[in-house]
Design a protein with these regions (language model features):
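Membrane-proximal envelope and lipid/glycan-remodeling enzymes
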Residues: 1-417
Length: 417
């Protein structure tokens, strides 16, 4: 019965992802998945080059400064070209995101099926895979730490992890920006599973440390913001039986370092420098190279927006709506880039407050060390991502998906506690 309830909940959540993804905003003005941004990158890679398999239009290449947002506005906003937020350098178009989703998702899909995976399909697939990893993790934690919890609770936790993680919001707007975020969700979920295996099976710790490092490395090749999360690898090296083993340190460092070097080489070949991910070459509505991308003056505003910003209630379905942000724009810090579809996570998903039960459970019941380490790891993943994006110049619901899944995982532990 327990497995049936959990399976039904999982199917319900994935069906929700599919419905929202298929009905949502994706690949605007682009009816053909073959021409979606990540498939353009996949086609380019299959052709032996790093730029998109798409020619830059003469309306762009003929400009004195193609990156000038006023000069490129006509070409950038022309629906025939779909240039917005692509990167441009030396007559070629690039994605400023990493190549991992193209290499590990879009190209294999094409080789196996002969078709081209739409962006929304990739986001749904990755969110479903990430959810599956988290469900397996929570089920293992439950059997080890909370064996007397009722059977139905796993089904409830599937709903918490699947709907309270903000994945539905990502699926509803599954375009090229959401693909690397969904990829990182899956990769970090796998890293946390390998983390748990490493702390519960110390005789196989080196193997699982290497797997966790590989997962973080793959995520870095998709979206470098994940690097702050990878600090949890240090927790795996802390136990006395592990920290003195050179093989454990090598397992933690080498896969991630190799992926970091690969990302640096990828950037050199595209933009001329290992740390240039292409943002300064973006075709955006602003001159991205001139922005104050990270600043301490944004922190408190962004934390308020991400965590406790209220919603507007109405009698119109779905009854809760994002606030009219024109009312808030006057209070934004200088150089702040604006607000995009944000409602406070702790307000819109109040079940996340259950995460507060975890430290009390640890203090009162003193479970084994593995649960303590996993809770710290999940907390660090959530906190480090939240703080990183608190310093960023703009707020967006897709950035919330960088830290809310970690809170949802902790909340599931809190419900069990």
């Amino acid at each position: 019965m327990e497995s049936r309830i959990a399976s039904a909940a999982f199917i319900l959540v994935v069906a929700t992802y599919i419905f929202l993804g298929g009905m949502g905003v994706t690949d605007r003005d682009n009816p053909a998945p073959r021409d979606a941004a990540y498939n353009l990158l996949a086609r380019g890679l299959l052709s032996g080059h790093l730029y998109l398999d798409k020619a830059a239009p003469a309306a762009l290449t003929g400009l004195k400064d193609p990156l000038d947002p006023e000069a490129n506005r006509i070409a950038r906003e022309d629906p025939r070209y779909r240039l917005h937020d692509l990167s441009y350098r030396k007559g070629r178009l690039y994605l400023y995101f990493g190549a991992a989703p193209a290499v590990l998702v879009f190209i294999p899909w094409h080789l196996l099926t002969g078709g081209w995976l739409p962006h929304w399909g990739a986001v749904v697939l990755l969110c479903a895979a990430g959810l599956a990893a988290n469900v397996v993790l929570v089920r293992s934690v439950r059997s080890r730490i909370f064996p007397k919890s009722p059977g139905w609770v796993l089904g409830a936790l599937v709903l918490l992890l699947g709907l309270g993680s903000y994945a539905p919001l990502l699926a509803a707007r599954a375009d090229m920006w959401e693909v690397p975020v969904a990829f990182n969700y899956f990769a970090v979920s796998m890293a946390l599973w390998f983390f748990w295996k490493a702390v519960t099976q110390p005789e196989k710790a080196v193997r699982y440390i290497a797997f966790a490092s590989c997962a973080f490395g793959a995520a870095f090749l998709s979206r470098p913001t994940v690097l702050v999360n990878a600090a949890i690898l240090l927790l795996l090296l802390a136990p006395r039986g592990v920290r003195g083993r050179p093989s454990a340190w090598a397992a933690a460092v080498f896969p991630l370092a190799f992926c970091g070097a690969a990302a640096g080489l990828y950037n050199v070949l595209r933009f001329g420098g290992p740390f240039d991910f292409g943002e300064s070459s973006q075709l955006a509505g602003v001159y991205v190279a001139h922005l104050h991308m990270f600043d301490g003056s944004y922190v408190w505003t962004n934390l308020r927006l991400y965590l406790v910003q209220g919603v507007d209630w109405s009698w119109v379905f779905p009854f809760a709506h994002e606030p009219a942000f024109w009312r808030l724009e006057g209070s934004l810090p200088v150089n702040h880039g604006g607000i995009e579809h944000v409602a406070g996570a702790l307000v819109s998903a109040p079940i996340l407050w259950a995460a507060l039960a975890v430290p009390f459970f640890i203090r009162l019941r003193r479970p084994d060390r593995s649960f303590l380490l996993l809770s710290v790891a999940a907390g660090w993943v959530a906190l480090s991502s939240l703080l990183l994006f608190a310093f960023f110049f703009g707020t967006s619901s897709r950035y919330q998906f960088e830290f809310v899944p970690g809170l949802a995982l902790l909340a599931s532990f809190g419900v069990l506690a």
